[in-house]
Structure formats: C-alpha cells, structure tokens
Regions:
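Carbohydrate-active catalytic/glycan-binding domains of CAZyme proteins
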Residues: 1-474
Length: 474
C-alpha cells in the first residue's frame, strides 16, 4: 500500500532528493524536528527503497551529524544533495544554516556514514560564499557527467520587505546582517563547475535562472526562482527544478546545456493544491516547497513536501506520479496514495491530502500566528521520534479529503475518532463523546468520485484513521 507522506508515521524529512544508486532509490533530505523552533534541527538520516516499491522505505540511520562540520555548533544542516563522483565515492553537498557556504562530506557507500571533506573554494582559494561579492549560497544540487561536475545553488528574495519586517530580520540575523543583505540583492540562481576533487571551482559562478527582481525574467515571469535548486538529466535534456517566488510550488526549466540556456517549462506540483480562480483560494494548507524528480520503470515521480503541526518547521515528504509528454512535464495533483489508485484497507488520517476550514486554508505558519483556533491540523501527542500522528481540532466547517481511491465495492467506511462531536463521512455520520479513540462504522454508498470527504458537523473531534471495507452494512 502506498500513502503520502511516504516515510513512516512521525518522520519529518523534507527537501527530498531521490537518487538511484546501486539498484536502490536513496532519499536524502534535511531533517525537521516535531515541535521544532526552526528548520532542520535534527541530523541527516537516509532512507532507501526498491525502485519498484516506493511504498516501503528502509531507514539507513543517521548518515551525518552537524557536529562533524566545523560550523555545526553555530547552525543546522540545511537541504543536501548527493552524487557519485568520478572516483566512485559518494559526495554529500550541504550548507549549514546562515553560513552561505557549501560543504562536502564523502563516503564509499550511498547509505553512509559520511565524513566531512571540506568546503567549496573559489579559484583564488577562499571559501566561496564568504566573500563580499560572492552570491548567497543555499540549497546545493550537484550533477556529475564523467569528469564534469556542476554545482547549483542560490536564494533570491521573493518580495520586498516592510520596515517592520526588516527590523525583525535584522534582529534574527544579528552578526549575519551582511549575509542577509547579500541574499536580498540576489537576482539569479547560480551554477559552478568543480574540479575532480569535488571541492575546487573551475572558473567563476554563472547566473542561471532569474529571481523575482531580475531585470528581465523572460519566460520565468510569474514563476521566478526563489530557492530549492535541483538538477536532473533525462535523455539529452537537462531539467532544473526549483521553488518559485510563490514558495508553495515546484517548477521546472529545460535546456540542452547544463549551465546555460534554461527556459521555463511549467509547474510540477504545488503543496497548496488546486487554485480556485473564482474564489481566489488554494485548497489546502501550504508552505515552502523543495524536491525533485525520479525516473524508474519508465515512470516519473515528483518528490515534494508539506507542512504539519501549524508550523513551517515540521515538514514531511510526499510523492506524486507525474507525466511527461514530448519532453514536457504535466502538473501533478495532490493525492493520499502517491498517485496510485488504492482500494479496501486501513489508512492513517494524516494521509489526507486536503485539509481546510470553511473553504479556506493558506500558509500553515500563519494559521497559528493569526490565532485561528478553528482550523484543523496534523499533529501528534508524543515527542519527536514517536509515531502517532492524527488530525486534530476537527470542528464544524472543517474538511478533510483523501484521494485517489477505487471505491467500487466499498460499502463501509469506519472512522476512528475521539473527542465530543459529529463528523459527516460521505452521506453518513459518525458521533463520539469519548476521551479515547473509538471506531465508528458508517455505511457508504458507491459514487463516481475517487475521493473520501469528511466534514465537521459540530463539536470538536480528532481523527486517527479511516478503514475502507467491502460488504459491510450498506
């Protein structure tokens, strides 16, 4: 059975970079902490899967700890990427938060454990990213073709800040204010060529795709680069994947060359879901996004992440099938099942791909900041590392949707809930008045939809799981 998020209950690994190494798919990402105060507070872990079964992932354990980096005590390990070098070893590229430095760790195995190797340096020997005229470096991506090594990075502002926001950012950045100022001046993502030592630059960094304040964004207008660089090559075409200035969407651009000539292609996926033009709203809670594309078994998959716990700092990875036609990717829709069609079985409530209140959602972090106590959210009772996620605060006006399912033959949906209230499940109702979890079966009548919808009718309940059953009471 395949569900989203694709990693186990209670695992928070966003910024996913999937790579096919030695016959398995290895997943590299940052590592959030449940209830964390900022991004990426935990050490890197790696998961791997058989390429024919992206529903079953094996934890390879901690592959790199922040104290292994000389700057690790001052920050956290942001989104990494990994590549097999010309020498057959595996190189992990990453950046410690608020450093503007790309660092490298190395290992003989894609599953770790990695050891610190050094920092990427310019031709004059200085650590690139530390110079006053250097671009702001962030979210590295790496491509190795024979002895040619390309490194991609960058972060561009997606808006101009108000004075009150600038005051906050000055306080946040403190001694790194100069670093923040460089970031605010960035107009493009950048690409660099590295020598075979995987550390030393060959030549200078080149601008690659435009950010929001580039003089001429060209084909990228409306979807300019924000962050989250990733790179893939399919056939003879290079695909640059990135998060746009809208934050919640992953986009792609294509070129016949790895270091220039990229033209905007389109949207891959938005963690905000579908956009309602008439109402001017997206359909689920959203936030920043970062991921990439995997090709396996003649099928393409887009990896991305979503937000939980009314926060930007407890993110989880998701997968969707994605189609390519004539070299162009078509946008993926959000699903609970990695784009597969599932049937009878038991599904955790946190696999809901749509969550909203009164037809409204928005950025996840702002829901808590604005004190919107009526909004539902995904959370857990235990501390970080302990499974047990569920949908909390499901009140009148709340809505959860699970896609994509084959509901032919399903005659009952049992919902496990607690609290005091009533929810509507399809055309039936489930009621509880209990402090503990209680399973309530609800008759289900076949419809033409491929989704399950639960809405809050009154009271306040939590939802742990749903079970789709053939036969039953209908």
């Amino acid at each position: 059975m395949k569900i989203n998020p694709y990693l186990p209950d209670g695992v928070y690994v966003p910024d996913g970079e999937p790579h096919l190494f030695e016959g398995r798919v290895y997943l590299y990402g940052s590592h959030d902490r449940f209830g964390g105060e900022t991004f990426c507070m935990n050490d890197y872990v790696c998961y791997s899967a058989d390429p024919s079964d992206l529903g079953s992932w094996r934890c390879e354990g901690v592959i790199y700890r922040r104290e292994q980096d000389p700057r690790g005590k001052e920050g956290y390990l942001y989104a990494p990427d990994c590549a097999k070098g010309p020498d057959g070893r595996y190189y992990l590229y990453y950046s410690v938060s608020d450093s503007s430095v790309i660092s490298v760790a190395v290992c003989a195995s894609p599953a770790g454990k990695f050891e610190y190797l050094g920092d990427v340096t310019a031709e004059d020997g200085h650590v690139f990213g530390t110079g006053e005229e250097d671009p702001y470096l962030f979210d590295p991506a790496v491509l190795v073709e024979g002895t040619d090594v390309y490194l991609y990075s960058g972060s561009c502002p997606y808006r101009r800040f108000k004075e009150t926001q600038i005051a906050y950012l000055r306080n946040h950045y403190g001694k790194n204010l100069r670093l923040f100022s460089r970031q605010m001046k960035s107009t493009h993502s950048v690409v660099m060529r590295l020598r075979s030592d995987m550390l030393s630059m060959r030549g200078t960094a080149k601008p690659l795709v435009p950010g929001a304040f580039a003089e001429n964004p060209g084909t990228f207008s409306g979807h300019e680069f924000f962050e989250a660089s990733s790179i893939r090559k399919f056939g003879d075409t290079y695909y640059f994947i990135y998060s746009s200035k809208l934050c919640h969407e992953l986009c792609w651009a294509a070129s016949s060359r790895p270091d220039e000539g990229f033209v905007y292609g389109g949207l891959l996926v938005s963690n905000a879901g579908r956009y309602d033009e008439e109402r001017g709203r997206y359909e689920t809670y959203c936030g920043n996004n970062h991921g990439s594309i995997l090709e396996t078994g003649r099928q393409y998959y887009v990896f991305y992440h979503r937000q939980t716990n009314r926060s930007s700092f407890s993110r989880q990875g998701c997968i969707e099938k994605i189609r390519m036609e004539s070299g162009r990717f078509l946008p993926a829709s959000l699903s609970s099942t990695q784009g597969e069609t599932e049937g009878a079985g038991e599904y955790p409530a946190y696999s809901a791909c749509i969550l909203q209140y009164d037809g409204n959602a928005g950025f996840s972090a702002s829901r808590a900041a604005e004190g919107r106590e009526n909004h539902p959210y995904i959370t857990q009772d235990g501390p970080d590392g302990v499974p047990g996620q569920y949908i909390a605060n499901f009140r009148q006006g709340a809505k959860a949707v699970w896609r994509s399912f084959d509901l032919s033959g399903i005659r009952e949906i049992a919902v496990t809930i607690r609290g005091s209230g009533v929810v509507r499940v399809g055309s039936g109702y489930a009621e509880t008045d209990s402090g503990g979890w209680r399973e309530v079966p609800v008759p289900f009548y076949e419809n033409e939809e491929n989704e399950i919808v639960i809405t809050g009718e009154y009271g306040n309940v939590d939802i742990l799981k749903i079970a789709l059953r053939e036969g039953g009471t209908a």
